[in-house]
Design a protein with these regions (language model features):
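Intrinsically disordered, low-complexity serine/threonine- and proline-rich regulatory segments
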Residues: 1-7, 90
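Short, contiguous hydrophobic alpha-helices characteristic of membrane insertion segments
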Residues: 4-5, 61, 110
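N-terminal helix-turn-helix DNA-binding core of bacterial DNA-binding proteins
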Residues: 5-48
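Basic amphipathic alpha-helical segments that dock to polyanions
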Residues: 49-56
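Beta-hairpin "wing" of winged helix-turn-helix
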Residues: 57-73, 78
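Basic, amphipathic "hinge/linker" alpha-helix immediately C-terminal to the N-terminal HTH DNA-binding motif
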Residues: 72-91
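Amphipathic alpha-helical dimerization/coiled-coil segments
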Residues: 85-110
């Protein structure tokens, strides 16, 4: 598992990309998908996940749908059109940043 520091700068991009690829999802489902995709190396906590989801919703990047599942309420998150365009922008920024960091550190990314 990675330390939380590198994750802080990439959390938004991770969430946007997962939602782009998988459509509407609820919070726990997002955490499990990220854990699966990262082969267990990234564990999202509620303390990092939900504030970011709420921020993205407030900025108009996400829309929500509340569904009653038995006696529980489940809140689903999905990208808006603006959120879908932000995914591309954030991915390009991240790839450029990784390239720059690898140059600065003089390491080759494989």
């Amino acid at each position: 598992m990675y330390s939380p520091e590198p994750l802080k700068g990439t959390l938004q991009t991770i969430l946007l990309k997962v939602l782009k690829d998988h459509g509407k999802m609820y919070g726990y489902e997002i955490t499990q998908r990220v854990k699966e995709l990262s082969e267990g190396r990234i564990h999202l906590t509620e303390g990092s996940l939900y504030p970011m989801l709420h921020r993205l919703e407030a900025e108009g990047m996400l829309k929500t749908e509340t569904v009653l599942m038995g006696k529980r309420v489940r809140k689903y998150y999905a990208l808006t059109a603006e959120g879908r365009s932000l995914v591309k922008e954030r991915l390009n920024e991240l790839f450029d940043f990784i390239k720059t960091i690898s140059t600065v550190l003089q390491v080759k990314i494989t």
